[in-house]
């Protein structure tokens, strides 16, 4: 028996721009907006890692506050070394990448979303370094990074940063999610 849908559902479930699962209960995307809130609600997020150097939109901050989601402003680290050695147009450096990876490797922060403005380059850099930590080969890491950069293409300097990142500096505590560092591809 077929049923006819007379009216579309009033609640639309729309994922954020460039949304994709990375691992179980770990997701990546661009900055969520108000139309993504129903989708995010179903993820039961505990932590969001914000990688951009600029403040997120006010509605995004309000949503996180109302839902008791912890926001880690990794792209906005203000220590003296980072301040003097960071390109003001791109907030990622060894310090911020290391901090993001240590948060990702702590399973106490899950479910987790890693995001930046568009979910391309900054998010792709951190996820690329995570893949290196997991033992992925560089061809697979680069392919995944380029999948999210679209027609603009990847940035060779980002890929070189991912390749040159010293994964041995990332501190993974016992019981915090060390399984994240063992997956190979």
Swiss-Prot record:
A GO CC term attached to the entry: cytoplasm
Domain of life: Eukaryota
GO MF annotation list: protein tyrosine phosphatase activity
Top EC class, one word: hydrolase
Active site (UniProt): 116
One of the protein's GO biological processes: cellular response to oxidative stress
Keyword Cytoplasm among record annotations: yes
Gene3D superfamilies cross-referenced by the UniProt entry: Protein tyrosine phosphatase superfamily (3.90.190.10)
Enzyme Commission code(s) on record: 3.1.3.48
Keywords linked to the UniProt accession: Cytoplasm, Hydrolase, Protein phosphatase, Stress response
All residue ranges annotated as the Tyrosine-protein phosphatase domain in the record: 18-178
Catalytic activity: O-phospho-L-tyrosyl-[protein] + H2O = L-tyrosyl-[protein] + phosphate
Cellular localisation: Cytoplasm
Family the entry assigns: Belongs to the protein-tyrosine phosphatase family.
Function: Putative tyrosine-protein phosphatase required for protection against superoxide stress.
Protein name (database record): Putative tyrosine-protein phosphatase OCA1
Organism the protein comes from: Meyerozyma guilliermondii (strain ATCC 6260 / CBS 566 / DSM 6381 / JCM 1539 / NBRC 10279 / NRRL Y-324)
Name of encoding gene: OCA1
């Amino acid at each position: 028996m077929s049923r006819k849908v007379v009216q579309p559902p009033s609640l639309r479930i729309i994922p954020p721009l460039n949304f994709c699962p990375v691992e179980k209960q770990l997701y990546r995307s661009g900055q969520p907006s108000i139309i993504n809130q129903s989708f995010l609600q179903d993820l039961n997020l505990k932590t969001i890692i914000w990688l951009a150097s600029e403040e997120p939109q006010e509605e995004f901050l309000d949503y996180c506050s109302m839902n008791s989601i912890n926001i880690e402003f990794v792209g906005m680290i203000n220590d003296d070394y980072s301040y003097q050695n960071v390109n003001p147009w791109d907030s990622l450096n060894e310090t911020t990448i290391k901090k993001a990876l240590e948060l990702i490797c702590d399973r106490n922060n899950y479910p987790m979303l890693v995001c930046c403005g568009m979910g391309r380059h900054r998010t792709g850099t951190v996820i690329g370094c995570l893949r290196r930590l997991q033992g992925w080969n560089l061809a697979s890491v680069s392919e995944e990074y380029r999948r999210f950069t679209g027609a603009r293409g990847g940035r060779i300097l980002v890929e070189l940063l991912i390749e040159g990142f010293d994964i041995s500096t990332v501190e993974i505590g016992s019981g915090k999610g060390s399984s994240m560092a063992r997956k190979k591809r």
